Amino acid sequence: MRDPDKVKSGPICDTVAVIVLEESDDENALPDVLHEVQSPHTSDNIPTSSIKKFARPRGWYNQSVSSPSEFFYQILTTERGTRRIAYVLSTWEEDEKTLNFKAVSIVLISQNFHPKAFKEILLEISNDLRTPEFSSSSELIRFLTYELVEEGSTIEIRTKTLHVELGFELIPISPVTGKDVAMLFKMLGFQNVIKIIHALLSDCRIVLASSSLMRLSRCQNAILSLLYPFEYVHSCVTILPDSLAEVLESPTPFLIGVLSEFVTSFGDENIVVYLDNGEVHVPDHAEIYKSDDYYYNSLHQRLRDVMFTTTSQEDLSIPNEERIEVDDFILDKKLRACFIYYFAELLYGYQYYILYTRIKGNFEKKLTTSLTFHVGAFRGFRKLTDMMSSSLLKSVYFQTFILTRALPRRKHDLFDEISCFKELDQLIFKQNSTSSESKKIIEHISCELIQKERYMEKCSARKQEIFTKIHWISGKELAQNNNSIIHTVKPKMRSNVILQAMLPVVNTHAEYHANQFEAYAHRIEALRNCLAAIFEGKVAFASKSLDAVKSSMRFAPLRIELCRLLNQKCSHDKLTDKQFEDIALLMNAALQAECEEDKDGVVRSLMYLSNVYSRKVAQGMQQYMYTAVQEHKVWKNQRFWTSCFYYEVHEMLFSEMLQKDRKITESLWCHTLRPCAMEMINTDDTDQEELVKQENEMIQAQAKHFANILISLQIPLSEEFFEHEDAHRSVLNEKCKWIVNTLDSILGVTGRINGLSLSRIQTYVEAHVESLRDVYVEMSTGEHLKKGNFDPVLAHGEFLISDPIDCYLLTSIEESEMSLNRLENLLPADGSLFLTNYRVIFKGKSVDINATNGTIVQTIPLYSMESFKKLTNKKLIPTQLIEKGVKIEHIISIRSSCASSIIIAFDEDEINNMAIEKFLEVIETNSHNSFAFYNTRKDMKVVENGSHKFGTLNSAIRGFTKKKTDTRRIRSHSSHRGSIQLSFDKMEELDYLKKNAHIRYAVIDYPRIGLNSKIVKLRMSHSNLDYTICPSYPGNFIVPSETNESELAKVAKGFVEHRLPVVVWMNENGALLVRASAFTSIDMVKKLKKVVNYRRNASKLTGSMTGSQQTLHSKASSNEESSSNIVAGAEIKSAEVQMNYIAKLSNSSQRAVSYALPTQYADKFSTFNDGCTLTQNNANGFPTTRIHRKALYVLLEKGHGVKIPIDSNAEAIMVRSVKESELRRSLQRARQICSSEFQVENRTSFLESWNASNWPQCVSRMIELSNSIVALMNLYNSSVAICLEAGRSITTILSSLSQLLSDPYYRTCDGFQVLVEKEWLAFGHYFHKDTETSSPSFICFLDCVYQISQQYPTAFEFSYFYISFLAYHSTAGYFRTFIDDCEEKRLQSDANEFYLPDNLATINVWEFIKLRNRVSAAFYNELYEQIGDIVIPSSSIPQIHMWPFLAETHLKYGSPYDIEPASHEQQLVDPDYEEEEDWSKLNNTDIDERHLNRRVRSPERDPANMDMIRLLQKSYLTELFDASDRKTTTNGESNGKETIHELTPFTVGARPVQCCYCTNILTRWSKAVHCKKCRIHVHEGCVNRNITIGNITHTWDAKPFEDIKMPSGAIQIGTPQAEKMLHSPNNTLTRESMSPPTANTIPPLCTGYLSKRGAKLKLWVPRFFVLYPDSPKVYYYEDFENWKTAEKPSGCIDLVDFKSFNLEQTGRRGLIELHMKNKTHRLLSENINEAIRWKECIEQVIRD
């Protein structure tokens, strides 16, 4: 044990050295150490050779002209981690031979901070070295390095030209700043300084930039001093040399100063402080924590008062006080006092929360006192909730702080004194930062700092110039003492006294915690009454207040009081079933509200109480409470168990010392009780061996006790654990390993001797499992089986959002009626209703045990919820419940748009009205949130910045590519208008887009149907990329090629919601299918009539039908006519645009064919009946032999017709379609016919009700109209434009069905996906028009598909389940595919989700189906055969069957369309059910061969051109992504001729250059290329085929480094001879162990420069690495030349002990971590692609 009265001593300086750069031709030559003197009394010296670069940060070079000398200091770190200060005097020496001036630096290293004094000493030494006749420097250096001085003394040194006085401290108690802090605040401002200090404490990387050496030194010293009482523990470099600029890309925290004249790029992730102009640059992604608002704002206020003292006097006409300028020295100390006061407030009372887990230490290993800090208890006591306090108390800063200040008998400093001020207790509680007491504290702190520094350093200023020649001879010995130096050691500055523990007064805080219980007195009284009623068996009284008491557990005083009351009632440890359930409910509610830090000790208290309370389940068998409280995350938090164990050992130690137990305080912790640990620690060494033995026994006993508690809370009492052997074994092994690891980490800190092995833990666990097995058997079969104790199987990402509620599930039809689903005869069922973020789940068992003993599950998607309805008809109550005596008061029907209704009933005696209303309220609140975007739009807070707010498709892709590691960009070479040009070299760029992005857009289908043909007068328009013309349309669509971009906006104004006519499909005969909304109101019709009248008087547009040919106008003539037809007046002009556009659509077919319809087909396809002008029957009822056709037929709603001129070659057809409102009502009636409430009120038959719903008529009418459209396009060869209503619903149904009937491709799985994406998603269908109901149009479309598949069972590749699956999930909200109503909103949603973690992101329905197809054929139609003809289904009502999806009820496993939960439910019920493989983890890019072989592909129109079609599709997508960017960049720019420059390899010289792409620095180790013409330099990793600057494109053909011919030197060293070392019987080491492989014919597998972390200074140093394919070692050299010239490697990394490989990206660079058995190697690459290349090569060598 150290002697408290012993005073330490040491030398003033550790090292004095002279460094000189001799003349050399090498630009990279390093200087020589001319002379060096090291103190023999210091063992932790810094080698002078390691600081040569730091002595001259601007670089070592000689010059022809002398320059003034410079002085600065560097803060360095020794190998043991202690800080040293290197004072450097840089000057110039004249060389007599060359007449140049050599660079000379005199370095003095010390641990004392006296810059002024040491500068004078260095000048004195320099002056003496230049005057050989005067040699006092030897004696001065001897005194500084050899003389021992007691700590606390003041040394005065006098010579003829020197007089300095300085204080001596081995370990400075507080920093010395002089005027540095005042200078820092004046340069940056106090807000920036506060930001910097908090950034340091948040582990940010900070770069200080300035052009001055001394400014960097002073500012870094000021910043480090403001951290007091903390010490900066990360990398700290005062001035970084120019050659080490790559350190700025280190991923670890640092504080580094750089010279702004050399470094131009400071890294995108670093905080940069520009000292010269006072600017601070903070990256957007930097996280800087700040304290609570009171402490943070108080610091601002105090700094403002100190810096601007006259603010309160400036507005007065006669100031009360005379303005006095504050000296910078005094201002410096006041500013430091504000920060000391700030940290004292944050850490006030920390002394009480230090846990001593071992006082005497392990006697055998001679360990010292072991201690930790109870973070959670301290934060709870101080009520700290901010992120900074949490981060700071767990950081390395605070751990170092505790280790140096926790011991009671030590020398106290200023912070110890300030942190124990009595005034702080009340000031923090009152939160009065501007009080007079606060100002007094700041004055006191500043006075203490001033008093210390005033006699720490005194010196006389030197004014004469130094000489220009050094005569010191290398190796010269120090001269003997010639008494030329007078030095005096004055008495100590302060008495070096070891004091007892200093503790603050926390009475005010303790009283506050005690008084807070008064604010909750009424709630505490309710809790006491409820617990009293529970323990007394008053069930009815307790149940009335149980819900309210459970809700009040969110308040901390209530949770604390619950623990106290349960602790007092321990005598009632044997509970009844009802008591057990109620207490478990309250304990779970308390644990749910507690955080993992356990601030008030509630979790620790309940941990012990759960092992006390139990209930009797059988004779001699008990179920303890810990089996009911295991589902909380805190039990899996290792930090909680560690702090809990330390606290228990801590209390055991001091209970032993006090010989009594400590009482529980107001927060269940005993920290603030006196005497505390720091007061009771005895440092006496008597009987130490016996005390250590007692401590070991105590810790071992506590470890066994905690092992039992861990086992009890980790082993589950569940069916999965006890019934399934595989799960039982895996859970058992996992829990055992976790318990062993937890105990090992705990006991390892306390210095254990013998721990608990894995075998012993397994023995304890097996014994515990055996005792639990009997309890489980009794619980699962006996009378203790809890009603409704069914845990639902949840989908991935699904979780409960409310507590389950007990209820009964009733049948949805009457018992007397014929049930469509025989499973409904199993109802009523008794169980629980669960509410998750996706579904409402009922799970239970049938009331009639004779019906079935299986589980009944029924689900409804939450997003599809339509309404609640309270049923009052008593006939709905089943007779089984009446016979059981169940009192049913409330019957609720929950209706859904995609599943059958759930009818639930509640027992009046068990569930009160409040619980029912609360549960339904939670359902209603969450029913508007889809599961697909639940994390994005509700719980997950996505950072809002500019890159997330996408308005166009192009900007969305730019947002996507920002997440990629490669900086390549997509550039299109296609023209702005006309046909799409292929860009084959851009195809692979699509791999960098978001996965499966090309599936979502309709544009990929246009090349397949021939819209890219030059014959077709169509083009793709990009005018809607910003969604301004029509927000509900896609960004690109097909329009006539004769239409201008500016004309489209005018055309759109004539249609509802601006949904103008666009082409969506083309038949093989050239007929087009056009979709649009209806024409606008009657006003627009009047405008069109005016145009018609005008055109009749001056007909300009003519069309002729001669023979079999149709004469069409050319593009030029159409433009002339359109321009000539414009007359004065806005109305006529606007309507003229509509007419011209209709005419252009009619003239845009591929070719004109015969207009005569054969007689034999006319009666079959003429089906427009009501108001249709197409059918012209003769007297016999058959069509005439020749029917005149039009090029375009426009389908309009009957009653909303528009007369189109005859000469426009188009005609309007009035049809009677189904309105969307009628479709909605029909679907609702169709769903209601199966509900019991409908059957009770309507005594009609089922078929009559089905026909009365009008749903079959709607489906029939849709098929009938689709057949007519197909007839027009295939037999009449005419184009059809569907313009009905808003163009979102009925138009979409008819357009989709027409394409489905005509094109066999759409009847395949891939084709149907494209059809839905194109017609329903891209063109803006409302799947959920409002928050209450969902659109019935998509259900009607799928019903039509089902009817067609019933008539043609072999025509579709997909199955009935596929159709029902899409129908279910179109309203369920599980997939993001059907959530938003237009392309623009989907882009925004996908962009937000792209930044979510992988566990929160969801997939679309098509990805799900593809993954499922890998393991199941449920979505495929086994009867599918290739049918290339048109399908014409019957539309008669007798042929329309009821779609079972509309009435089906699933009670066995839940909805089968929730595939994953349903399969797991089936696995739980059916033991013989074989679970399929984990298909959710499969890669959908791989194709299952069995499905490829089984599936029959539909015939394409030109199979020989399939590859071209795929390229066309990708080219269209590239055009889609780049159109907006191309429009913005080409607008207003001249189309200059493109010039191509070639990039060539480039070697960087001594001076770094800047990369013109990423703006980072190119060093001599960087792989670089440059353009000789443009004089640009680029990283090789930044080049992506080309770099365009203006009209100049720079190309680069990358050549792999491995293709370079091996140097002859490298081949020579490839076959080294085994050169034996000095022979020894035990020495077998040869040079082969450090040499590359011996095979000279094998080239290296991978080579290149990587930065390696240094061992001493922890800096990143570039090395040349070589990996051979036949050697398990990675060799590295100093540079490429060393490898080339066959030099010996500097070292190697042995891959024999390789464990794992970790790859991370830090900015532009890639960080490689090679984890070996006993060591981890960290390497930095130039870019992430280089790191990936090394990873693949290393893995290849390991595999081989």
Swiss-Prot record:
Residues 1643-1743 form the PH domain. Residues 1102-1116 have a biased composition (Polar residues). InterPro entries: cDENN_dom, dDENN_dom, DENN_C, GRAM, Myotubularin, Myotubularin-like_Pase_dom, PE/DAG-bd, PH-like_dom_sf. Residues 787-871 form the GRAM domain. Keywords: Metal-binding, Zinc, Zinc-finger. One of its GO terms (molecular function) is zinc ion binding. The keyword NADP does not apply. Residues 996-1447 form the Myotubularin phosphatase domain. Transmembrane segments: none annotated. The keyword Transcription does not apply. Residues 14-150 form the uDENN domain. Residues 1102-1123 are annotated as: Disordered. Disruption phenotype: RNAi-mediated knockdown causes no obvious phenotype. SMART domains: dDENN, DENN, GRAM, PH, uDENN. Residues 165-304 form the cDENN domain. Residues 306-412 form the dDENN domain. One of its GO terms (cellular component) is membrane. Pfam families: DENN, GRAM, Myotub-related, PH, SBF2. A zinc finger (Phorbol-ester/DAG-type) spans 1540-1590. CDD domains: C1 (cd00029), PH-GRAM_MTMR5_MTMR13 (cd13208), PTP-MTMR5-like (cd14534). PANTHER family: MYOTUBULARIN-RELATED, SET DOMAIN BINDING FACTOR, ISOFORM A. Probably acts as an adapter for other myotubularin-like phosphatases. Belongs to the protein-tyrosine phosphatase family. Non-receptor class myotubularin subfamily. This is Myotubularin-related protein 5.
